[in-house]
């Protein structure tokens, strides 16, 4: 009795050249996506709210490869303008941390720059208001000092016996 065993051909167990190239491209993309999101996390620290979250594609080899990713960061202003300036700088640095920032990364960096500029404007306005209040107070003290001797006060006579 003869017996036969089936062995799959090498063509069916190995990927063809086109599939191998596709897998290699997916591996490179996966590596870049992970490095990109890790750069955000490394710089972001306490700004990171969630992530990384990845979108995957299944390659011809049946494995999943990350093809996109995101990290959610806190982009809200801080309690005060003075605290907002360094936070905005941190947000911008986090957004631009990857060596290849995406359009979304540039958009977040622009928002952070606007937040920083607004906070600096608020700080400058508060300083102007404080100086104006100090000048007004100084002028008031100066006027009071002028009248201290009584010589500059308008004359008034009071006759209690009239």
Predicted features by range, described:
Residues 1-162:
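Type III/flagellar secretion export determinants
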């Amino acid at each position: 009795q003869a017996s036969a065993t089936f062995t799959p051909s090498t063509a069916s167990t190995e990927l063809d050249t086109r599939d191998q190239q596709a897998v290699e491209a997916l591996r490179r993309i996966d590596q870049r996506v992970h490095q990109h999101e890790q750069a955000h996390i490394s710089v972001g620290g306490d700004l990171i709210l969630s992530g990384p979250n990845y979108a995957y594609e299944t390659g011809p080899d049946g494995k999943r490869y990350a093809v996109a990713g995101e990290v959610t960061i806190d982009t809200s202003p801080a309690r005060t303008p003075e605290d907002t300036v360094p936070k905005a700088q941190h947000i911008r640095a986090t957004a631009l941390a990857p060596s290849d920032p995406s359009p979304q990364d540039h958009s977040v960096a622009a928002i952070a720059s606007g937040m920083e500029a607004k906070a600096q404007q608020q700080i400058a306005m508060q300083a102007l208001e404080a100086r104006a209040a100090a000048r007004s107070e100084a002028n008031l003290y100066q006027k009071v000092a002028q009248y201290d001797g009584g010589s500059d006060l308008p004359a008034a006579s009071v006759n209690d016996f009239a």
